[in-house]
Amino acid sequence: MKAKLLVLLCTFTATYADTICIGYHANNSTDTVDTVLEKNVTVTHSVNLLEDSHNGKLCLLKGIAPLQLGNCSVAGWILGNPECESLISKESWSYIVETPNPENGTCYPGYFADYEELREQLSSVSSFERFEIFPKESSWPNHTVTGVSASCSHNGKSSFYRNLLWLTEKNGLYPNLSKSYVNNKEKEVLVLWGVHHPSNIGVQRAIYHTENAYVSVVSSHYSRRFTPEIAKRPKVRDQEGRINYYWTLLEPGDTIIFEANGNLIAPWYAFALSRGFESGIITSNAPMNECDAKCQTPQGAINSSLPFQNVHPVTIGECPKYVRSAKLRMVTGLRNIPSIQSRGLFGAIAGFIEGGWTGMIDGWYGYHHQNEQGSGYAADQKSTQNAINGITNKVNSVIEKMNTQFTAVGKEFNKLERRMENLNKKVDDGFLDIWTYNAELLVLLENERTLDFHDSNVKNLYEKVKSQLKNNAKEIGNGCFEFYHKCNNECMESVKNGTYDYPKYSEESKLNREKIDGVKLESMGVYQILAIYSTVASSLVLLVSLGAISFWMCSNGSLQCRICI
């Protein structure tokens, strides 16, 4: 019996066994990503795809300065408001900056026809050539060309637009006029003019000497006849009269003809336009700085190569796509679940089931071994490098596909087009929602695939070791194997590099396996003997207890015993 109890004790004092575990890298990263199935998954490595910062300044765009309109609007600049005279010399720019409420627009009150469309056209212009379409001194010999207005004063004196001429009577006459221009610039030419609408017939007679005036403007793509509307109007900038402003684009080789017998605000300067796909008009109060950037928004410049941004939907230059997302992070590493570094019954550190290894720093997947010569970590470089290459290519591919750099300028609508503007906003919002949904779904799917890819790689590494060891070792859980034979460092290395010699260790493993199986059988016999002894002893104790209770009850009369024959 003593011998059997000794065998039982031996089963609880198992001898040391060599082990090898398959696991993965872990670190102290707090990066979190979302997947299709989970949110806020902590991972070892990830890349951000969403730019959410800007410098708060207006910058040069690829070394080219913007055109800052200052206190002038686009209308004041292009018509030549005297207060915008400093802008006349500006002929090239990277983009145009207009403040939210500029003071200097049309100095003489009136309606600017198709102004929003003109802004849209100018938003794609990066430079122009300003030239005299009808020279002031020679084009109108029979008319006075010095018409001015107090509403367009400059330096305290009455003045007028720098790109238009107000033609009035000369020597008491206003002869019919006819003037034409042929576009020989090999570019589109922007031509602007106006029609004066006096407040009463007396002003009409005094300036133009006719009550039935007209203005006709004709080109291959434009034809319109204007009749002055003489009426008293509320004063604006101390003026009861109005000037309505018009424009057209003249194609190369085309001719524009002006005919009038009064009320014409004639073109003086026109503009040969050069288009630039990265130009645009933004409305901003941001300060100008000497910085240089590739992407500009009204809030500030963005210097980023990321595919998405949530700074502002209006952008100029090579800019990330605007989305409404608050977070777009793509996983490149593994789930970050550092294992509790405690040792189990066999001294093995938890493997890929319970968590990763912070001690393995030179790879994503690998091994931890323990034998008589010590213990240590080793990364599986081949599987790690293959994974890095695959994920890097995938991330680069996603960024390349989604990183469509472009300019997104705001669309222009006048006050009478609110329904169209609201409809446009709904359409834009719809597209923006689709873009945001597509971007978020893409990241969620790729994150799910990447984490599954890592899990698959760890499993494949585990199966690789298992197929080599076969029955020379046993699986003990947590991604670990316990050898049935001694496995020194050379042996461990052969398992890691796939050259493990199974036949070399099979005989030793067989003997040790049989010994362990014998101990198990002997232990089972001991358990059976103990079970029998325990049952018999328990029964005897129960019988003695019942007899004692019966004797006590009979002695005090609580229990009567009768024997009938």
UniProtKB/Swiss-Prot annotation:
Coarsely, its chief localization is virion
Q: List the disulfide bonds.
A: C21-C480, C59-C291, C72-C84, C107-C152, C295-C319, C487-C491
GO molecular function per UniProt:
host cell surface receptor binding
Question: Record's InterPro entries?
Answer: Capsid_hemagglutn (IPR008980), Hemagglutn_HA1_a/b_dom_sf (IPR013828), Hemagglutn_influenz_A (IPR000149), Hemagglutn_influenz_A/B (IPR001364)
Q: Name one Pfam family in it.
A: Hemagglutinin
* Feature type site, description Cleavage: R343, G344
Q: Does the keyword Disulfide bond apply?
A: yes
The alphabetized UniProt keywords are: Clathrin- and caveolin-independent endocytosis of virus by host, Clathrin-mediated endocytosis of virus by host, Disulfide bond, Fusion of virus membrane with host endosomal membrane, Fusion of virus membrane with host membrane, Glycoprotein, Hemagglutinin, Host cell membrane, Host membrane, Host-virus interaction, Lipoprotein, Membrane, Palmitate, Signal, Transmembrane, Transmembrane helix, Viral attachment to host cell, Viral envelope protein, Viral penetration into host cytoplasm, Virion, Virus endocytosis by host, Virus entry into host cell
Topological domain ranges for the Extracellular compartment? 18-528
The entry's other comment says: Major glycoprotein, comprises over 80% of the envelope proteins present in virus particle. The extent of infection into host organism is determined by HA. Influenza viruses bud from the apical surface of polarized epithelial cells (e.g. bronchial epithelial cells) into lumen of lungs and are therefore usually pneumotropic. The reason is that HA is cleaved by tryptase clara which is restricted to lungs. However, HAs of H5 and H7 pantropic avian viruses subtypes can be cleaved by furin and subtilisin-type enzymes, allowing the virus to grow in other organs than lungs.
Family designation? Belongs to the influenza viruses hemagglutinin family.
What is the annotated role of this protein in its UniProt record? Binds to sialic acid-containing receptors on the cell surface, bringing about the attachment of the virus particle to the cell. This attachment induces virion internalization either through clathrin-dependent endocytosis or through clathrin- and caveolin-independent pathway. Plays a major role in the determination of host range restriction and virulence. Class I viral fusion protein. Responsible for penetration of the virus into the cell cytoplasm by mediating the fusion of the membrane of the endocytosed virus particle with the endosomal membrane.
Q: What is this protein called?
A: Hemagglutinin
Give the originating organism: Influenza A virus (strain A/China:Nanchang/11/1996 H1N1)
